[in-house]
Amino acid sequence: MVRVRLAPSPTGTLHIGTARTAVFNWLFARNQNGSFLLRIEDTDKERSKPEFTQNILEGLQWLGLDWDGDPVIQSEQTERHRSAIQTLLEKGLAYRCYASEEELDAMRTQQKAANQAPRYDNRHRDLTPEQEAAFQAEGRDAVIRFRIDEHREIRWNDLVRGPMLWRGADLGGDMVVARRAPADQIGDPLYNLVVVIDDAAMAISHVIRGEDHIANTAKQLLLYEALSLPVPTFAHAPLILNPEGRKLSKRDGVTSINDFRAMGYTPEALANYMTLLGWSVPEGMNEIFTLEAAAKVFDFDRVNKAGAKFDWDKLNWLNAQVLHSWEPANLLNALAPLWADQGWTLPDTTGWSLSLVELLGPSLTLLNDGVDQAKPFFMEPALEDDALKQLDQEGAKACLQALLSTLEEAPWSGESIDQAQEMLKSAAATAGVKKGILMKSLRAALLGRLQGPDLLTTWSLLAQIGQDLPRLRRCL
């Protein structure tokens, strides 16, 4: 049975790279009728925070990525990790290294001066008992290192990249599997070791993660072998790149799912877009889809090896398509809390509110656009420069005065658009101006600007809440 996992570290909010990895894991698990599991890798005691764990869980739920079972907490598995390290020590596959940080820094400085890649030189790999005793007598603490055969070839078949080959000589020397601690203790177990132990304990069948973990995979395969554990299948997805082709990072600005959510992106559009970051839709499939639809056809044959450049225009287009597909009631449910945050109160009639979202919906790209565009319907807007220039045009105020006089004699409820058309025609004729001048001037008076949604519907909505006449009067 397919069992995959997402293993985020709660040292920050949910990052889009982690979220895209979650999407690929979820899609594969659902495609294979398997399980999508969560493991919280909280072994970084200083940086891991419960609020980040909560943020990650809430972000996954918001995106529609449900998981199976309860999340595994890595820090609760520490004794299992230490037991594995003890096994490696007893087999002679790991050893204590007493080299101080100062000695290691000096080693790296010498390597840099000689234009050599930084690596541990395995200096304490074969200490005699007397040498170990001498270091312990000095009071030195020790890390625990796993022996890496530099002549070893490490091979695996990657579901994305095909046959892979790494050499032991390229892994930087014997790797540290436990932090520095007194010689009679095992320090805190480190990433490559704990991941192997936890994946085996969770019976993970496939490890799906970013290509920046490829070197870790080579190291972890050696640990699987040393501990006689079943080896999962690996798939390394392409990295998400910024528009310049570099790995997307916090320096690029928006990278947290929190940020995308706050900007007004929908979970449907964001999940859709993240799926397209490195995966190609099958021929004949629309690139606007639900996660459930993608899961039916997802496989690694269509996952690209090359990095996926983040395209804001594409994401914005997808988000607009999602918003435009929503029923007015659903859009109102999404916009009403944003309007409430502004202190705006909706009229008692649901019909007016639905008419407003029907008017604004086709022009929305982000949900937050619905705040800016709705503002003139809740607050009297300031007159922008282009609106002031329009109102200074010859005949503009005369036609508005004619329209105001008509409305004061026979108030319009905002219900009959045909009646509004007749009033506009009459006012333009009375003022002796073209209807187009009146239309532009009316928009300037009602909205404070010359761009906006359908004018007659706008006027109708403002008339229904008694806001059309005050706005005409202030311009005269």
UniProtKB/Swiss-Prot annotation:
Gene3D superfamilies associated with the record: 1.10.10.350, Glutamate-tRNA synthetase, class I, anticodon-binding domain 1, Glutamyl-trna Synthetase, Domain 2, Glutamyl-tRNA Synthetase, Domain 3, HUPs
Keyword Cytoplasm attributed: yes
Positions of transmembrane segments: none
Any one GO cellular component localisation term in the record: cytosol
Keyword flag Cytoplasm: yes
Reaction catalysis annotation: tRNA(Glu) + L-glutamate + ATP = L-glutamyl-tRNA(Glu) + AMP + diphosphate
Binding site for ATP: 250
Protein name as it appears in the record: Glutamate--tRNA ligase
Organism: Synechococcus sp. (strain WH7803)
Gene behind the chain: gltX
